[in-house]
Amino acid sequence: MEDFVRQCFNPMIVELAEKAMKEYGEDLKIETNKFAAICTHLEVCFMYSDFHFINEQGESIVVELDDPNALLKHRFEIIEGRDRTMAWTVVNSICNTTGAEKPKFLPDLYDYKENRFIEIGVTRREVHIYYLEKANKIKSENTHIHIFSFTGEEMATKADYTLDEESRARIKTRLFTIRQEMANRGLWDSFRQSERGEETIEERFEITGTMRRLADQSLPPNFSCLENFRAYVDGFEPNGCIEGKLSQMSKEVNARIEPFLKTTPRPIKLPDGPPCFQRSKFLLMDALKLSIEDPSHEGEGIPLYDAIKCMRTFFGWKEPYIVKPHEKGINPNYLLSWKQVLAELQDIENEEKIPRTKNMKKTSQLKWALGENMAPEKVDFDNCRDISDLKQYDSDEPELRSLSSWIQNEFNKACELTDSIWIELDEIGEDVAPIEYIASMRRNYFTAEVSHCRATEYIMKGVYINTALLNASCAAMDDFQLIPMISKCRTKEGRRKTNLYGFIIKGRSHLRNDTDVVNFVSMEFSLTDPRLEPHKWEKYCVLEIGDMLLRSAIGQMSRPMFLYVRTNGTSKIKMKWGMEMRRCLLQSLQQIESMIEAESSVKEKDMTKEFFENKSETWPIGESPKGVEEGSIGKVCRTLLAKSVFNSLYASPQLEGFSAESRKLLLVVQALRDNLEPGTFDLGGLYEAIEECLINDPWVLLNASWFNSFLTHALR
């Protein structure tokens, strides 16, 4: 059969059929009848279109010989034979320019004279059976169906055959010839019997054994077996009364399907209340680093040695005092804790040999800050069964918080470039396959765009802090260990740099379960005056600890240096995910890759180089009250990375819930934009589910605000 196909059909048609089978993962050496069927279908589509034009007067004419003087437009747009992405691009373009309704399945042709899509069918069976199967699958009055058979029969929607008698006769003659040629070679019977109906994957997929019994058991009431249920579902009219069907299925259901129009959605309601506060485990845009370049000191790489070396670079220490107290805490204890850190670091420096780790003295201020002996005593449940008024602690509902501008500023800052390189290119051997070459080229381009990004600094800082804290939690369970907050990078000139952001002191850490909590006190350097946005620093006690000389264009100036101190906590599972923050790079690279793939499939060649090197082109980054924001491909990379990093830094049940529920609304809005006429029921319930996730989390509130901007501009 394969030899026959290659002899009988035009090489271009054979090549297109090969590509189509490859795209669907089918082997033409095995599925030879399918190979022949695809070639036949392609040829009929091309013959349907051949010689049909529209002249200047808009009339349909048949021109067999090319007349160079005629200003003619092809009557039919051929969609069949293109790869799926390109085919859908053509369909979307036609819908946009002609106002035609977008079909649910890829049609074969578009008729510019009748302004309709056409589905061509070629069958080896009865034409009316195949026609009904096609109509049942497409379920659209706007796509015209035209079926041909190898016996010369044809059938079309409303008996409207589109083409003139002669053009259709040409197609029928060609099909009859193919049949005769196959019969002469003894191939026809096998080819005729191999045709299957317009099936879906589910119909072909036989369910047997345990799965079959489970399927039969899990049917809605009033259905005895899966076949009955399937037949019932297949009988649903596409535009019939769904509400009635639902109420037939169950007396409990009384859903009413409402059309979803541009005027239907309302903005998500953000909560009122005091402004939200910073809740990340470490400072982001407000962090200050004490740094050493080209570190070569004794013990370089040992965190405590590096920290002491960094501390020595600063000479502006002064007697610390509180500038912004914590509303509920015993603030003098925070001040005493910092003084204790300074004193114990001084003690280390006075020793002959600096130790590798430092356990702090268990002073009253540290015991208070780390919640030592604060946990209620655990009692075995069996010992208190008889207590009549046994109940769980009453816990207050969380206070609602409103969106504050600082979180948008944090995000903007995370997208910016720094003057340091935070990740190196992976050391990978020579590429051995073309796909590896493309993958490493994409990775290298992407790395170049994000290696200087502040979000990448947050990744490396997060990885370091979580790794150090988890190690200390396992290695020194009973100790109040001092953990320097360190990161490493390179300057633009390539010199190595070690940075100190501050210190963590961890509490007792007998972590048996993944969710068991270890308390810690963080002390972080900053030049940000907390009195400018006191609501952001609700959970912090802020000290002024020194004065820093800064060089600027107008000379040297002195700025107060602050220390942001707070009690915090984390768990084994959170630290494990914190150590995995490099995954954010992979996630955002995959998102960029899917953009490149879409572009490449339209252009039918790899577009990686053009994608990254065409600096003049702009891409959509996100929504703001001003509209769709656009930027360079580098800005897109950094924005996607920052979103992924913030999802990690601000991970919470509120974020999980908001992401899952708002996605449903997003899909409905997208369906409306694609003219799919979506319908919804209980839209109010969906809004309720979304809005119950908007409590006090700054990142969730910002995402909800972005979603509202998207709704405004998407539905204009």
Swiss-Prot record:
Among InterPro entries, the record links this protein to: INFV_PA (IPR037534), PA/PA-X (IPR001009), PA/PA-X_sf (IPR038372)
Could you state what the record's PTM comment says about this protein?
Phosphorylated on serines and threonines by host kinases, including human casein kinase II.
Q: Which GO molecular-function terms appear in the entry?
A: endonuclease activity; metal ion binding; RNA binding
**Where is this protein chiefly located?**
host cell
How is this protein annotated for GO cellular component? host cell cytoplasm; host cell nucleus
**Motif span (Nuclear localization signal 1 (NLS1))?**
124-139
Give one Pfam family, short name only.
Flu_PA
Q: Which residues bind Mn(2+) 1?
A: 41, 108, 119-120
Q: Look up the EC number in the record and give it.
A: 3.1.-.-
Task: Supply the alphabetized keyword list.
Answer: Cap snatching, Endonuclease, Eukaryotic host gene expression shutoff by virus, Eukaryotic host transcription shutoff by virus, Host cytoplasm, Host gene expression shutoff by virus, Host nucleus, Host-virus interaction, Hydrolase, Inhibition of host RNA polymerase II by virus, Manganese, Metal-binding, Nuclease, Phosphoprotein
Localization (cell): Host cytoplasm; Host nucleus
Cofactors (names): Mn(2+)
Which cysteine pairs make disulfide bonds? none
Q: How is the cofactor bound?
A: Binds 2 manganese ions per subunit.
Q: Which GO terms describe its biological process?
A: cap snatching; DNA-templated transcription; symbiont-mediated suppression of host gene expression; symbiont-mediated suppression of host mRNA transcription via inhibition of RNA polymerase II activity; viral RNA genome replication; viral translational frameshifting
Task: Give the location of motif Nuclear localization signal 2 (NLS2) in residue numbers.
Answer: 184-247
Residues engaged in binding Mn(2+) 2: 80, 108
- Family, as annotated: Belongs to the influenza viruses PA family.
Q: What does this protein do?
A: Plays an essential role in viral RNA transcription and replication by forming the heterotrimeric polymerase complex together with PB1 and PB2 subunits. The complex transcribes viral mRNAs by using a unique mechanism called cap-snatching. It consists in the hijacking and cleavage of host capped pre-mRNAs. These short capped RNAs are then used as primers for viral mRNAs. The PB2 subunit is responsible for the binding of the 5' cap of cellular pre-mRNAs which are subsequently cleaved after 10-13 nucleotides by the PA subunit that carries the endonuclease activity.
Assembly and binders: Influenza RNA polymerase is composed of three subunits: PB1, PB2 and PA. Interacts (via C-terminus) with PB1 (via N-terminus).
Q: What is this protein called?
A: Polymerase acidic protein
What organism does this protein naturally occur in? Influenza A virus (strain A/Memphis/101/1972 H3N2)
Q: Which gene encodes it?
A: PA
